[in-house]
Amino acid sequence: MASIIGIDLGTTNSAVAVMHGGEPVIIPTAEGGRLCPSVVAFTKHGERLVGQIAKRQSLTNAARTIHSVKRHMGADWSVNIDGKPYSAPEIAAAILEKLRADAEAFLGGPVTRAVITVPAYFSDSQRQATRDAGRIAGLDVVRIINEPTTAALAYGLAQENLHTVLVWDLGGGTFDVSVLELGDGVFEVKATSGDTRLGGDDWDQRIVEWLVEDFKTAEGIGLRDDATAMQRIREAAERAKIELSSTVSTRISLPFIGARGDTPRHLERELTRAQLEHMTADLLERVVLPTRTAMADARVTPEDLDRIILVGGLTRMPAVVNLVTELFGKPPHREINPDEVVAIGAAIQAGVLAGEVPDVVLLDVTPLSLGIATAGGVFTRIITRNTTIPVRKTETFTTAVDNQSAVDIQVLQGEREMAADNIGLGRFQLSGIRPAAKGIPRIQVAFDIDVNGIVHVSARDIATGHRREVKVTPASGLIPEQVDRLIAEAAANRERDRRKREVAELRLRIDDLMTDAERVLADALGKLPSVTTQPLADAVEQAKQTPAGAGLGQLRLLADDLQRISYEVMEALYRYNAAERAARAAGVPTAGASEGEAPHADGDTASADETSADGD
């Protein structure tokens, strides 16, 4: 049976893992990393780039590069590229396709099934959008699972003498906290809470705002409308945030960030950990209420917790660790890389579903209450939050006016008392109700939540047997027919997309080789004769003139020629430098090679057209 992979579809980075030899293993990306940046870009030539290659070119292509798409899952959001709108599931699908391709390369065969993780506090619309993304990527999403639950799996906590565990997950774009009860291989989530709009991106944005405002005050130059400058600042902000987790201050240096007239201006700022903690104090404060809510819902105190697990890259920050320690009165555990722990847990759950991991049972919960709108605009709950899933519950309702022959049923998710303040999941009408005085008809409304946390709703008139089911469509606007079309498009274009990616990667390789070649040529100036360096200069010029429509064969030839000729010139330069050092050591004066001459290893020079010693 083909392996089921586990995917952590993250806001900043994503990861994929699989059970291999009985152990969960992170699958490396094609570029050699363990994490894949959750970045998708479209080049001006129409190629789609994903991951590290997309992130590398974002400075020169900021307007066509998409970051943090996870924050838009389930929302009515799209990005327009060359006149074509792309929804959040379509962009996320590009990331999932990349992870799937990396997994296939690692496993040496096709991959069609996956477990995909989501924040515990994701709504039904967000979960549906994630499932759609998987389908568009050509994956059968066998389970949508909450990230904190997979973290507990990764730690193998059911095998230890632990009973109550709290998972505290602060990632790139979302925050979750879950309380789990463990015993005899059973992982039961007792309560969950969180904020799907809080994460590392918000810390980055505070640094960005500080840099932009500070630069405007100091230089009188606004940078907000300069897409390239803002992308440079965002990348610098993220680097600074990461560095301040391990050092007390960092230097942010962005030369030529702007100009006043013809005079370039540079951004040079020192940022301390104390400054960052001060400017983000309110963000950190926002994690406190969801943490206390989850504990109250689970009816536990800090003393009841056997272990606190930290998940997510932002939990490396000392301020975060200190806050968690203060909240619970005990230090958290961070033995597993917080950026990889969710993918590892997803692989274990995939192993459970494939029968590779025995004696483990997951009992997850729904993060928000589900119900319908009733008379007076009230939200009537049918399934309350933190109910263990899968679950089915029914309630009986009646009509509000005499001789009512139909009822509109509005399906909602949330915790507010009024219907208008909650998340609308769908609406449908049950007709054919037998005319009667109000309060007489009996209408049974049933809510089903499956193991993926996805909702199915039906209504039935008990007297007539008439029944209707709601089609819960995510706010992303993708109906099943659209998803099917996108799946077909992705499958039909997979080979073409692979070739486009190869072309894009080759172009980037050629750009890197040209940069290296120009550096070599600059270093060789005055040292090597033009007969040695001219082929490299010609190759660089030829690469610069490459037409936009150049094919794979032409690009490979260009790249190989550039690399080969560069090596030849570098070898000649190495021999020259070695000869020069030897001459200096011997006290012999040296000079740069003249036209048509190249240095010998002993420090002498020989004409390029010099004949052999015997004159033949």
For each feature predicted by the language model, list its residue ranges.
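Oxyanion-binding/catalytic loops of NTP- or PPi-dependent enzymes
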Residues: 1-75, 79-85, 101-616
